[in-house]
Amino acid sequence: MILGNRIPYEYFATSGKGESEAGSKGLKYETGSYDAALTDAGIENCNVIEYTSVIPTSAKLIPKEEGLKRIRWGEVMECIKAQSNGDKGSFISAAVMTTDVYDHKNKYLGGFALEYSGSGTKEEALKSLATSLKGLIERRGYGLIDNKVEIFKDNKTSKGYILHPGKIFVYDSLHVKKEHGSVFAALCWVSHKFPSSKNSKTRKNK
């Protein structure tokens, strides 16, 4: 049997923030505050790998509590993640927001996640994410959005596509009081599907 590329299936949303006085030269966040943020989010014993921003059509959101219970020590945790780091005295924030996409016949195509990393408030993060969504949709040829994107509402493009941003919105922030601080928001996958390849027959060599 020949299998197609695996498709991310069940996932949960989480966020975390952390601070530390420790930090090696060149990696001042990864060795302390980022690890503290992973612990705050409940995924500190995973090997975290980042995806880009596409959510499969069949992906299923599960409660965070259920997702955390299924984690095994040392497993690969694949995430769509936004992260912000800062030093003592700074304010840092991160956010992830999903967007459902429907075609002109109202067929659900799948979704996208948009990431924000910076020092903005929740409202500023939403504004930035709305701008990012507009560009993402236009680059893919789904049409233009004449007015500003409305979060938590349906938005129709010039080609009839329907976008609904904000079904999932995760935001976290931190006023850094120690030497280093990190904050992140993420969608974390805990299972995958393996579809059969359409071209399952192998061609014989001549």
What are these regions (language model features)?
Residues M1-K206:
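Helix-coil modules at protein/domain termini and other flexible surface or pore-lining loops
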